[in-house]
Amino acid sequence: MTEEISLPLSVEPIEPLIGFQVMDAWVGVGTFLVLDLATSDSRQTGKLWIYLADWAIMARGEEVRASETLPENREERLPVDELIGRHLTAATRLDDEELHLEFSQDAHLEIWENRTAYGVGAELLHIFRDGEKTVTLTFPQPSIH
């Protein structure tokens, strides 16, 4: 049985997926972004589900798709071809509110908190390994001084 844990914003749970290739990517309901990943021999799989966060996909220095610019009231799944075939090469936490995932061929995915839309302490992403949900990353609660 896989244990589900909730963590403050950290790249450690993503690191085991470094080197995996994006096999499929799409936007689901609302702004949910899903990346299906696998090793080159497809023996290990992973999934990153960007859940309650804003995001932008950058390729060669230009924004190619963003949660803020999606068509409203769409009912169909929207493919994200810009990441398919690329390998996840790094994950970086910029601060307590932003995470960057780097991909081969000069692409990256920026993920950041939107407290207005999703509230404080929202779930940033869910990580799955070999079909099992393993980790939920949450934005940390703001500290009160």
What is the predicted role of each segment?
Residues 1-145:
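Surface-exposed, interaction-prone regions used to assemble/regulate multi-protein complexes
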